[in-house]
C-alpha cells in the first residue's frame, strides 16, 4: 500500500477505530492510570468489530519470508524523555511510579502494578514486562505490509492501540501467530482482544486468512 493510500485509510477510519477501542476498554496511551485488567468490550463495540471484520478481505497470506525485524526500527521518543515502551508501562499499569529518565517502577508496598491480560499473570518488575504487538509485525507483513516504507513501519511499530503489556511466557507463546493459531489462555479477554485486533487490521488496510477470520469470529462470539 502506498504512503498516500495508507494515510487516507488511517484518516478515514481513525474515528471509527478509536470509538471501537474505547468501547472495548482498549484505550490508546494517554497518560492516565487505568485498572490493570482490561474492561470487557461492550455489545456496541463487539457489533462494530463484527462489521469491521466483515469488511476485511479474506485471502491466503503471503509467506512472510521477506520479513526482517530490523526494518521496523525501535521505540520512538515522546515528551518528557519517555519512549513508547515506557508510556505503555505507565498507561497500562496501576500505581506505577516514574523515575529519572521516565523509568517506570512499582513500589514494594502496593499490589503488582501490571497484570498480563493474556494469562492473568501479576507482574511487579517492569523489566519482566514485555510489550506485545497484538497484530504481530510479521503477521502485518504477511497480510499487506510488505511494501510499506520505513515511516509506515515505524508508525505501526509504535502505535499504542496495538501494544499490550504482557508476561514473557504469554509473549513467547504467542510469537507471530494470528488468532487462527493462537488465542489468549485467559478466555475472559477474548472479546476485547479480538475487537482491538480487528480494529488494527482495518486501520492499516490489512487482510485476514480464512483460519484467522474464523478464530476472530469465535472470539467475538464470547462478547456479552
Tell what function each PLM region has.
Residues 114-224:
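Domain-level detector of nuclease and nuclease-like folds
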Residues 8-11, 83, 158:
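Intrinsically disordered, low-complexity proline-rich regions
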Residues 16-21:
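Sec-dependent N-terminal signal peptides
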Residues 27-30:
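Bacterial signal peptide processing site
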Residues 23-25:
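C-terminal motif of bacterial Sec signal peptides marking the signal peptidase cleavage site
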Residues 36-114, 130, 139:
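Cell wall/extracellular polymer interaction/catalysis modules
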Residues 1-14:
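Bacterial N-terminal signal peptides that target proteins for export
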Amino acid at each position: 500500500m502506498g504512503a498516500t493510500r495508507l494515510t487516507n485509510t488511517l484518516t478515514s477510519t481513525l474515528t471509527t477505530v478509536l470509538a471501537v477501542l474505547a468501547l472495548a476498554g482498549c484505550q490508546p496511551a494517554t497518560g492516565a492510570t487505568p485498572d490493570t485488567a482490561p474492561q470487557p468490550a461492550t455489545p456496541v463495540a463487539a457489533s462494530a468489530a463484527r462489521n469491521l471484520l466483515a469488511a476485511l478481505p479474506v485471502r491466503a497470506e503471503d509467506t512472510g519470508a521477506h520479513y526482517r525485524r530490523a526494518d521496523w526500527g525501535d521505540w520512538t521518543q515522546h515528551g518528557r524523555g519517555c519512549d513508547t515502551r515506557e508510556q505503555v508501562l505507565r498507561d497500562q499499569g496501576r500505581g506505577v511510579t516514574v523515575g529519572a529518565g521516565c523509568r517506570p517502577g512499582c513500589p514494594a508496598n502496593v499490589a503488582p502494578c501490571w497484570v498480563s491480560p493474556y494469562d492473568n499473570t501479576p507482574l511487579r518488575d517492569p523489566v519482566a514486562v514485555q510489550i506485545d504487538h497484538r497484530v504481530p509485525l510479521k503477521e502485518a507483513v504477511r497480510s499487506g505490509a510488505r511494501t510499506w516504507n520505513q515511516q509506515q513501519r515505524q508508525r505501526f511499530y509504535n502505535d499504542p492501540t496495538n501494544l499490550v503489556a504482557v508476561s514473557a511466557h504469554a509473549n513467547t507463546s504467542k510469537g507471530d501467530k494470528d488468532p487462527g493459531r493462537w488465542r489468549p489462555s485467559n478466555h475472559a479477554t477474548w472479546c476485547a482482544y479480538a475487537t482491538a485486533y480487528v480494529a488494527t487490521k482495518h486501520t492499516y488496510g490489512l487482510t485476514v486468512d480464512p483460519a484467522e477470520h474464523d478464530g476472530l469470529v469465535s472470539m467475538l462470539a464470547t462478547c456479552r
